[in-house]
Swiss-Prot record:
It comes from the Bacteria. ATP binds at T62, P63, A64, G65, E66, G67, K68, S69. One of its GO terms (molecular function) is formate-tetrahydrofolate ligase activity. This is Formate--tetrahydrofolate ligase. The lineage of its organism: Bacteria, Bacillati, Bacillota, Bacilli, Lactobacillales. Pathway: One-carbon metabolism; tetrahydrofolate interconversion. The gene is fhs.
Amino acid sequence: MNDIEISQNAEMLPIQTIAKQAGFDEKVVEPYGHYKAKIDIFSEKPNTQLGKLVLVTSINPTPAGEGKSTVTVGLGDALNDLTGSAMIALREPSQGPVMGMKGGATGGGYSQVIPMDDINLHFTGDMHALTAANNTLAALIDNHLQQGNELNIDPRTIVWRRCLDINDRALRNIVIGLGGRFSGVPREDKFDITVASELMAILCLAQDLKDLKERINRILIANNYDGQPIFVKDLHVGGAIATLLKDAIKPNLVQTLGHTPAIIHGGPFANIAHGCNSVLATKTALRHAKYTVTEAGFGADLGAEKFLDIKTPVLGKQPDAIVIVATVRALKYNGGAKLADLKIEDVEALQKGYINLQRHIKNMQRYNIPVTVSINHFISDTDQEVNTLVKLIEAEGISAIVTDAWAKGGAGSKDLANEVIALADTNQGPMTKLYDNNGRIEDKIKTIVQKIYGGSDVEYSPQALKKIKECVANGWDHLPICMAKSQYSFSDDPKQLGAPSDFVMHVNDINIRLGAGFLVVQTGKVLTMPGLPKHPAALDIDIDSKGEITGLF
């Protein structure tokens, strides 16, 4: 059976049963049907004691797929089986990848969160609420221009964009306000995909409703004609925007195929945002379980770095262990093997491609957190390839655990779970910080480029230098850095596989995200509104007369 067939044939427990198992009072459980619920954490008396936190990351993604979410879910099931108290905290899927190329984000095989089709399609409406809130703010800005422009906003400086939760390249560059003086002030604008909206980052970093509203009010929307910054608070609409997110801020509860409680909430991409699920979701799981397994988007150079340098300080809890997911076939691809040949034994390509995993291992060890590698097993992997990879990893002084979560779920992940339990009990002391937030913007960027990516230097466009000067002048240079970079390579060139070194990173622009609390550094050709591929996944999705969905993955 494929993923959706496995999901549809699963025996799900009522969500109230899952909530009780997780220790939630029935009064805070707000069901969305039989198998989904919102958790009203603001009505819950919080447990101040936090469990162990396990961060799952991976090597750079390849067309072959790494199975990071699959390993995350399988590990969560195995930990729950072994300890009786584990939860999973994941991001919500975006409709863009579901209908585009990447597919959903619920794991695979017998290591899935369910109901898979509901989660991948609309879920509890969080993405729509974020889209509505984002576009309401955009409409209010343009209405302010139309109604006399009391704040003297320079339309050419407006940085707040409209958004849509679908890949639509035709909306990357648009002109609005056409049709005469009753149709608004004409100006150029752009659409982003919803998960790239600053509101998504804010939702995922907010500690509560008060913090949410304060962060929204801090959003920089434009400059006035005197060059002074204009914020949402100047429009007096922060409360209205926060109101539209009053339900979206509540974490969502579902279950795995193994009936492990899973909280799915928030979904920023790691290549254009910080790539982590919400602080509220992670903290809720930590308060209710001995072990919380969470993941960060794309490879460790993006998602894990941002988890550790952006999310962890807000969360107030560092990971107790890090799992790096790798596959034999993805490393062979990094070693020069062709996509069509990845099922053929090629130890030489594996050894060449290992440098990609090796750099990720060294990067994670830099933070002084225990690390292990999960070798996500595929049927095409040969014994010689697996044994070779295990020896290479163990030469780094860490463990390598072969995992078969797709085919066996939690049962195929118990060795990994036992290793994680042992690592999480190791007292390593405080996490080592990568950089000092109070350092110069250029120094922080260069530190990431040199220490994490393996580059040698950074080149800035005139626009990027202008933004740095603006940040310094306004006292915004103390914010952490959120790199927007290709997920396929350590460099800003997606074709440079393996572990490129001594390259120059090209910074095109810097987006100032005061509400989220970081600076987005735009590199290479990263797009905040993706396009659909020649054969989008939507072509294979269908529904029959009984409401059964096919083609989701």
